[in-house]
A protein has these predicted regions:
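A conserved regulatory-domain signal marking ACT and ACT-like small-molecule sensing domains
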Residues: 1-142
Length: 142
């Protein structure tokens, strides 16, 4: 995966800014996988195979034209999902998962949990993907 991080001070107060970011992806014919966000930032996670270097360069340039304070790109990323309906009523699931990553010396680049609490997405470096799955398996199933 590729993660494009767009930073803009007080982005949350700008009407339509996220739509403009997504419109750029639409113009390039690219769907996004996840879109974690904060007050000043949106991270767009897209499949690397759908975004060759020339498309990525155009996207970054268009985002800069939208007056972003900063646009950065992380390549060679992986997404690891922890999924389960029982997570909704279970205290400490995220803590156990992050502790498992820490114990395995895996740096978490991003965390996203939807309001349904059915899944937690962890962004890690691609080189750590297999070790991440093993760490979570050992924590929750061993």
């Amino acid at each position: 995966f590729i993660t494009i991080h767009v930073y803009k001070y007080m982005m949350n107060r700008l009407i339509g800014y996220a739509r403009k970011l997504l419109s750029v992806l639409e113009e390039e014919g690219i769907a996004f996988e996840h879109m974690p966000s904060g007050i000043d930032s949106i991270s767009l996670i897209i499949r690397e195979k759908h975004c060759p270097p020339e498309k990525l360069e155009r996207i970054v340039e268009k985002y800069k034209q939208l007056d972003a304070d900063s646009v950065t790109v992380d390549q060679d990323q992986a997404i690891v999902m922890l999924v389960g309906r029982g997570m909704t009523k279970t205290v400490g699931v995220a803590m156990r998962a992050t502790a498992a990553f820490s114990k395995a010396k895996i740096n978490i680049r991003m965390i996203n949990q939807g309001s349904s609490e059915v899944s937690i997405m962890f962004g890690v470096e691609a080189k750590d993907a297999k070790a991440s799955v093993i760490a979570l398996y050992n924590e929750f199933f061993n």
